[in-house]
A protein has these predicted regions:
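A structural signal for short, well-ordered beta-strand segments
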Residues: 24, 73, 108-112
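Generic non-transmembrane alpha-helical segments
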Residues: 54-58, 90-101
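Conserved long alpha-helical elements within nucleotide-processing catalytic cores of c-di-GMP signaling
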Residues: 7-23, 30-57, 66-70, 74-75, ...
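Catalytic-core segments of nucleotide cyclases and related cyclic-nucleotide turnover enzymes
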Residues: 85-92, 96, 114-142
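A structural signal for hydrophobic residues in beta-strands of small regulatory alpha/beta folds
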Residues: 76-77, 114
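Catalytic core regions of nucleotide second-messenger enzymes
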Residues: 67-68, 95-113, 141
Length: 142
């Protein structure tokens, strides 16, 4: 695919095969439709690829990274749980230094939640992470 990341089916499979503790992180590109409408889909695609590369560089050794929708990404972390906040800060800092076609990178809203192995806890963590991502996104708009 475009970003060379796993897709939604790979993400769901990875969650089902997760043993032990972990975390799920959701990422949503801020104002992505506006980027496509203003600069065109080629620049939008370049943004997605750059974000995917940034995700790989920060989270790649600690978990698996997936593109689960148009401008939505997910990381399933299974290592370095104590470094989530640090990794999130590093990701945002790297993103702020990047450009695509002379344009600064858009912001990315992030939400995460930790889980253990029980299916109920895992499903709740996914819901919490998703809700947190949208809370952050809404907070940025106001």
């Amino acid at each position: 695919g475009l970003t060379e990341l796993g897709n939604r089916w790979g993400y769901e499979d990875r969650l089902q095969r997760t043993n032990g503790q972990g975390a799920v992180l959701f990422f949503d590109v801020d104002c992505f439709k506006q980027i496509n409408d203003t600069y065109g889909h080629t620049v939008g695609d370049q943004c997605l690829c750059a974000i995917a590369q940034c995700l790989r560089s920060v989270y790649g050794t600690s978990g698996r990274i997936f593109r689960i929708g148009g401008d939505e990404f997910c990381v399933v972390l299974v290592r370095n749980m104590d470094r989530i906040e640090q990794m999130n800060r590093t990701f945002q800092q790297k993103l702020q230094t990047m450009q695509v076609s002379g344009m600064p990178m858009p912001g990315v809203s992030v939400g995460y939640a930790e889980f253990d192995t029980s299916e109920e806890e895992l499903n709740e963590a996914v819901e919490r992470a998703d809700a947190e991502m949208y809370r952050v996104k809404k907070e940025k708009k106001s």
